[in-house]
Amino acid sequence: MTQNPVKFVHPFPFEVPFFNKGMDKFVMKHLIRRFVNQFGMTYTSHILDQLKILGFQQATDAAISLGIDDLLTTPSKAWLIQDAQQRGFASERHHDYGNVHAVEKLRQLIEVWHATSEYLRREMNPNFRMTDPLNPVHMMSFSGARGSTSQVHQLVGMRGLMSDPRGKIVDLPIQGNFREGLSLTEYIISCYGARKGVVDTSIRTADAGYLTRRLVEVVQHLVVRKVDCGTIQGLFVNLIQDRETIKNKFVLQTLIGRVLADDVYIHGRCIATRNEDIGIKLANQLYYFQVQPIYIRTPFTCKSIYWICQLCYGRNTTHSNLIELGEAVGIIAGQSIGEPGTQLTLRTFHTGGVFTGDIAEHVRAPFTGKIEFNENLVYPTRTRHGHPAYICYNSLDVTINNQYEVQNLTIPPESLLFIQNNQLVESEQVIAEVRAKRSPFKEKVKKHIYSDLTGEMHRSIPMSNLILETTHLWVLSGSIYESVVVPFSSDQDQVDIPELLLDKHKSLSNYSVDQVKHESVDSNCFEKGKKILNYFETDRTIPNEHKDSIYSAILFENTHMSVKKEKNKLIVPLWCDKQWGKRRIPCPDFIFRIPRGQGILLNKKHIFAFLNDPRSKMIKYGNILGGYSIEKKRNSLENQLDGGPRLKIKKTYASLISVGTNEIIINMIQISLLKYPFFNIAKRENIASSPFLFHNKLGHTNLNDQSKLLSKGTIRSLPNENKKDESFTILSPSDFLQIVLFHDLKCLNTVKKLDANKKRIELSGLLGHLHSIANRFPYSHFMTYKKVLLTERSISNNDSNNFQLAKCYFMDEKREIYQFDSCRNIIFDFFNLNLYFCLSNFFEKTFSVVSLGQFCSESIWISEDKQLQGSGQIVVVHEESFVIRLAKPYLGARGATLNSYYGKILSQGDTLITMLYERLKSDDIIQGLPKVEQLSEARSNTSISKNRKKRFQKLNRYLAIFFGNFWGSFTSVRMTMEDSQNQLVDEIQKVYRSQGVQISDKHIEIIVRQITSKVLVVDVDRSENKNWENGLGSLFLPGELVGLSRVQRMDRALEKRINYRTILLGMTNASLNTQSFLSEASFQETAQVLAKSALQGRIDWLKGLKENVILGGMIPVGTGFNRLVKRSKMNSRTSQKSLFINKVEDFFFEHQDQALILSLKQKETSKNKKETSKNKKETSKNKKETSKNKKETSKNKKETSKNKKEASKNKK
C-alpha cells in the first residue's frame, strides 16, 4: 500500500534553493542564514535540532570512528620538501659567496618553507576528496564539527616554521607531522609552541578580560534613545577599493545592516532612498553594479551627545530588524570586540607558534615558448631575496609564442620580472611576481649579523659607520692570543707558535758571572732616573735623558752573529756591523755561557728566556770575546759586538717551493733551507723563528733528516689604549689555503743536476729579491705535467730533456713577465689584465690575473674546470700556485650600521653589522591582542600603515577647496579626524579578520567614537575677550578636556571663538573623563576621583548604567529609558522650520552657516512674537464676540420661553 505524496496547499512565498552537494561548514552557514531571514529564530532553531538528530543517527549507523590509520599523508609532500631543501641550499651557498646578506637569506628561507607548507595544506582537501572522501578526519574538519584546517595540516602535512618565545621565526622548519613523528630537534623546537599555548591560556586570557572591561567601561552609557537625530552627514563606502584591501567575504559585511544617508541611483534610476536599511538583496545589487561611493549613516556622525539614534546604528546583528529603542548598544559593542580575544587565546594551545602569513602571487608561463617584451619599460632592480630582476612601473605587455600558439599577458604595475627579453621559458615557469595589493602587518626590527670567524675586519671601500651603498666586508681568518704583557713580537713579525713564550716576570739565575748578581729584573726594568742595583760591578745610574732597554745577540753553534732589522728582504745576511754613534756607555768584560740549543732574548721592556730544550745543562760551548757597547736607538738599547774576529759567511738563498700531487691542498707557508742557517725577517720587525726549518710536505718523505716541521704564523698587533691588556692575532696554518693551478702533477725526486745551458731566472719575489736555486742544490725537484694549461695535448718542446719544467708563471706584484726557453710568445694585455699564452700550433687560453692582496670569492672559477674552494685574500703567489688567507665575505646593505672599524680584531660571534629591516608580523591573535590594545589606548608609538600614493591622489582633489577658502582649515581638520577614525577601525579589523573572526564595523565605530569625542582647549585670549569679567570667557580653561559637541554649542553662544584641537584619548583616559564621577570612581583611582569631584562640586545626573547599578536604581535600558526622554515643547510650525534648517549641508563644523542660522532664528523669533500678539488680539476679540453671542443666546432663550408661554395660553 502506497501513501499519497504530500502536496503543499500553500506554497512557500519565496523560491527555495535546492542543495545537492556536500554540506560543509560554509554551505551550512549560508543555509542557516537563509532560514533566519525567511522563518525567524524560533523556526530555525527547530530545523537545526532536526539536522542535529539526523547527523547523530547517520554517524551511529555508519559506525564512524577515528583511528591513526585514517591520517593519510599527502603524496606530493616528498618532492615538495626536496625542492624546498634544494632552494635552501642554494640560498646558503649564495650567502657564503657574499652575494646575499643575512636578511635576504632569512627572508627567502622563511618564504620558501612557508610557501611549501601552504601548498601542502591546499592539496590536503583535494587529496582527501580523490582518495578517501569518507575519511573521518576529512569529514570532521571540513564539516565544522571539530578541528580546523591548520590543525589537520599539522597531523598529516607538516608543522612548518615556528616562532620562538620572542616572536622571531626559527629558521629551521619542522618537516615532520604528528603522524610520521618528530625528530629530537623538531620536538625541542615544537616545545616553544606548546609552552606558548600554556602561557597564553593562563596569562593572555586575563589580558583579554581586562581589555573587555576597559572597552565596556568607555561605552557603558550608550543606549538607543531616539529614532532619528536628523544628521545629514555620513560615511562613504567604496566597494571597489575595499575589495582590494580586505577579503571578499568581508566586503558585503560593511554594508549589510546599515542605513543609507542619501539616495542611491543606478543609471539615473533611484533604487534606494535615504534612511532605508540595507539588506542582503540590496547589498548584492550595490556590489555587483559597482555603485561607488555609497553614503551610509554611522555612529561617528550621530548628533546625539550621550546616546545613539536608531538610524545611525542600523540593524541589530542578531536578527534582521532595526535596533529597538532602549537597547544598550555600548555594552554590546564592548563585549563584541573583547570576547573574540578571550576565545581566540585558547586556540593557540593546539597550533601555537606556527608561523602563518600570505604567499606572493606569481605569474607563470602558460606553455613553453619564447617570451618578448619592451626592454625600455623595465628597469633592473634587486629583489627582497637578493636576486637580480626587472621592475615595471607601469603595465607591461608580454608575448609568449612558439610554433603552435601565441598568447599575450599583461603584467600589473610595480611587478617583478624574473626573465629576460627573447628568453626561452618552460611551461609553468615563474616569469613575474605581482606586488601584494594590501600590505600585511609589518614591524621594523634590527638584525645583528655576527662574525663566523675569528680574525681581522677589512672592507673594500672607505666608509663611515653608516653604509651608504651595498658593499662587501671581509673577515680575514686568524686566532687571538690574549696576553697580560706587552708581546715579545711586534706587528708583522713571523714567529713559531710552539716557541712563543710570554711571561711578565722572569728570573735570570744560573746565568751569572762575577759582575751579575742573582737578581730578578722586572718587566719595566729601565725607567727614567731609576738606579739598577747590583747589575754591574759598580752601581751606576743610567742618565735621565732617555729610556734604556737591552738587546742580546742570538748565538748559534760555531757561528757568531748579530741580527739587525731589515726592510723588505727575504734573504738576510747573517752578519751586520752597522754602528750607531750617539752615546756609548762602556761596560766591563763579561762572558755569557749559553748551552747548546738555547738562547737568551732581551726585548723592549721585557726579559725573556727563549729555551728550546730546558732539560739541557750548562755547557761551555762558545764564548763571545770583546767588549760590548750600549747605544741609543729609538729610545732603546741595542747590543752590538764591538771587537773580536768577524766571520765572513757566504751568501744564502731561499725560495718558496711547493710540489703538489693530485690536487693536495697544503695549508701552510713553506720555507726551504738551502745550505746555511738563515732567518726569515718580515718588515723591519723582531725575529722569533727557528733557525732550522726544512722543506717538508704532508704525505711526503723528508729530504733531510735534520728537518723538522713547525707551524708558522704572522702576528698582527691590536692597538689598545690599555697597555696592561693587549692582544694580537696569530695566523695559524689552518688560516691559509694553497691552490694548485695544475690539474695532474707528479713529483720526481731525482738526483740530477740541471743542464748548464739552462737559463737561470731571477724573479722578483714576494718580499724581496729571489735567486734561482737550480744549480745550487745537489738534488732538485722535477715536475711532469700531464695537463699543461688544462689542454689534453702536451706542449711541444724543442729541448731533448727527459723532464719538463713549469711552462708558465703567474705574475707577481710588480706585473713582470719572464720568457722561458720552453714557452713562447707570451703576451700581456695591460688593459684586460689577462695573461695570454700563445703557443705554437695551439689555440689561446686565457687566465685571469691574480695579484697580492686581491680578495677572491669561493664562487669564482680560476680555470675552465677548477673552482676556488674557499674565499679569502691572496697573500702568496707561487710559480704554479697561490696561497689564500681564508676569509668570510659579508654583504652590507645600504643603510646598515657598521659596528667595527677597519683592521679591528674580531672574535667569533662579535657583532659585525646591524641592519634594520621589515618583517611580517605573525597573524596569531596573541600578537594581535596587544595591537588592538595599542590602538584602543591611542599610544604614541602606534604605527598606522597607509597606502601613501592613493592618499595623496585623494588629497589632490581637495586642494582646490583648501586654497582660497577661509574655511579650508576647518575642512582639513574635519577630514583628518574622519580619516583617523576610519584608519583605527580598519587596523582593529585586520587583527580579527586574519583569524577569520567577523565583527561588525559599527561596534568598533562606537568605541572609536568615544575615544575621539573629546577636544583639548588650547588658548583663551583674555585681552580681546570683552565678556571675561562676567564669566563667559572663563568657561573653558586651557588644557581642559571638553566634549566636541559641547564646545561647538558654546562656540555659537559666545562672541569670541574657542580655540581647541582634536585629540585621541585612550580607553582608560576616556573612561576617566566622563560626565559621571561615580562611573569614573568605580573604574580606577577611586580616592583621587572622589576628592577631585567633591572639590569641583560635580553633579552626577545618573544617565548611565553603571551609576544606577551602584545606587540600586532602575537602569535606563529597555523599558526604563522612557523616564529620561523629554517631549519636545516646540509647535509644529517651528519644528518643521528647524527640520528645514537641519537639512542644510554643513562641511565646516557649521561655522560658515552660523550667521544665517542666527538671523533665521532671530527672524523666526520676531515673527513668532508678532503672530502671538496678533493671536492675543484675535483671542480678545473672539472673547467679546463670544460674550455678545452669549447675551444674544440668553435673549433668544427668553424669547423662546415667552413664545412657549403664549403657545400654551392659546391652547388653553
From Swiss-Prot:
CDD domains hit by this protein: RNAP_beta'_C
Binding site for Zn(2+): 229, 302, 309, 312
InterPro entries for this protein: DNA-dir_RpoC2_beta_pp, RNA_pol_beta''_euk, RNA_pol_Rpb1_3_sf, RNA_pol_Rpb1_4, RNA_pol_Rpb1_5, Rpb1_funnel_sf
Region annotated Disordered, chain positions: 1162-1212
Keyword check for GTP-binding: no
Protein origin, superkingdom: Eukaryota
Cofactor(s) this protein cannot do without: Zn(2+)
Catalyzed reactions per annotation: RNA(n) + a ribonucleoside 5'-triphosphate = RNA(n+1) + diphosphate
Subcellular location as annotated: Plastid, Chloroplast
Cofactor note: Binds 1 Zn(2+) ion per subunit.
Keywords: Chloroplast, DNA-directed RNA polymerase, Metal-binding, Nucleotidyltransferase, Plastid, Transcription, Transferase, Zinc
UniProt-listed Pfam families: RNA_pol_Rpb1_4, RNA_pol_Rpb1_5
GO molecular-function terms, A-Z: DNA binding; DNA-directed RNA polymerase activity; zinc ion binding
Gene Ontology BP, a term: DNA-templated transcription
EC numbers for this chain: 2.7.7.6
GO cellular component: chloroplast; DNA-directed RNA polymerase complex; mitochondrion
Alphabetized HAMAP family for the sequence: RNApol_bact_RpoC2 (MF_01324)
Xref: NCBIfam families: rpoC2_cyan
PANTHER family in the cross-refs: DNA-DIRECTED RNA POLYMERASE SUBUNIT BETA
Function: DNA-dependent RNA polymerase catalyzes the transcription of DNA into RNA using the four ribonucleoside triphosphates as substrates.
Subunit structure: In plastids the minimal PEP RNA polymerase catalytic core is composed of four subunits: alpha, beta, beta', and beta''. When a (nuclear-encoded) sigma factor is associated with the core the holoenzyme is formed, which can initiate transcription.
Protein family according to the UniProt entry: Belongs to the RNA polymerase beta' chain family. RpoC2 subfamily.
Protein name per UniProt: DNA-directed RNA polymerase subunit beta''
Source organism of the structure: Cryptomeria japonica
Gene name in the database record: rpoC2
